[in-house]
């Protein structure tokens, strides 16, 4: 998979923090949770066989069972230990999975994803709640990692444990009432994310109202009839003169090629 470059805090709209470690992550796979994965009686998360080898080398607990350690993608420094079990060609995670489901509040329709640190080699697990919950593409976590589409490699910042979609941008974090330099009211910090979004939407709507829509009216065009090369112009014939002499109408025709005018008469 192609590696994604680390993004600065200014790009993702998060405030820069001191001593923040950014780790490049490699996407392994994700699983859409079914009701059978959340059954409290079995405590079993089925893993496709082609994805099991992506976990790498497993450890053994004191009872002799294979276990896999995952670092929580949201809570900094928290580790999850799942017992690996294989039976009749079916692979899955057993002991420890029920506790993870209960703490994260997972339900059928949620998605869990697995990642590996490109440099450290540690495994990470993260969950996505609901079918409509999406993670921002090319985003970062202050502690955990982002959830871009599968082909991308997310980033991990080991500090605060917030998703980039939950971190307000610098422009949304504070609202300024008046002008501080001009004697207005000082800026106040608004902790409510809903009020920040509402303020941002009001600014966008006010800018849209000031915009004037200009509709261009096409000017009428006069089409010129085409002139083909085979066409030639013919002069209009001169008008025929009519004279009445002694009760007889005399028509004077145009001059012929011989130079003599033709005359026709009618009673």
Swiss-Prot record:
Q: What is its main location?
A: nucleus
Q: Which SMART domains does this one have?
A: B3
InterPro entries named in the record? B3_DNA-bd, DNA-bd_pseudobarrel_sf, LEC2-like
Localization in the cell: Nucleus
UniProt region (Disordered), positions on chain: 172-221
Q: Pfam families from the xrefs?
A: B3
Q: Name one GO molecular function term.
A: DNA-binding transcription factor activity
List GO terms (cellular component aspect).
Answer: nucleus
Basic residues bias spans: 205-214
Going by the UniProt record, its keywords in alphabetical order are: DNA-binding, Nucleus, Transcription, Transcription regulation
Q: Which SUPFAM superfamilies match?
A: DNA-binding pseudobarrel domain
> Is Nucleus one of the keywords UniProt gives this record?
yes
Q: Which residues bind DNA?
A: 30-131
Record protein name field: B3 domain-containing protein Os02g0455800
Species the sequence originates in: Oryza sativa subsp. japonica
Q: What taxonomic lineage is listed for the species of origin?
A: Eukaryota, Viridiplantae, Streptophyta, Embryophyta, Tracheophyta
């Amino acid at each position: 998979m192609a590696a994604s470059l680390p993004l600065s805090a200014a790009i993702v709209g998060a405030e820069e923090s001191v001593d923040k470690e950014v780790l490049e992550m490699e996407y392994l796979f994700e699983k859409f949770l079914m009701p059978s994965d959340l059954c409290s009686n079995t405590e079993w998360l089925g893993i496709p066989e082609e994805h099991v080898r992506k976990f790498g080398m497993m450890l053994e607990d004191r009872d002799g069972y294979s276990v896999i350690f995952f670092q929580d993608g949201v809570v900094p420094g928290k580790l999850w230990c799942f017992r690996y079990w294989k039976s009749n060609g079916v692979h899955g995670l057993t002991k420890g999975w029920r506790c993870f489901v209960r703490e994260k509040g997972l339900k059928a329709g949620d998605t869990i994803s697995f990642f590996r640190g490109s440099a450290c080699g540690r495994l990470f697990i993260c969950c996505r709640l609901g079918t409509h919950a999406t993670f921002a593409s090319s985003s970062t976590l202050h502690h955990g990692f982002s959830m871009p589409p599968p082909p991308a490699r997310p980033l991990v910042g080991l500090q605060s444990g917030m998703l980039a979609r939950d971190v307000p941008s610098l422009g949304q974090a504070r609202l300024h009432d008046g002008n501080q330099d001009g004697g207005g009211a000082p800026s106040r910090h608004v902790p409510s994310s809903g009020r920040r979004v509402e303020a941002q939407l009001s600014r966008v709507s006010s800018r849209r109202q000031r915009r004037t829509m200009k509709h261009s009216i096409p000017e009428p065009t006069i089409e010129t009839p085409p002139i083909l090369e085979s066409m030639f112009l013919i002069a209009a014939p001169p008008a025929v003169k009519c004279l009445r002499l002694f009760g007889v109408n005399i028509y004077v025709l145009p001059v012929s090629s011989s130079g003599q005018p033709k005359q026709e008469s009618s009673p």
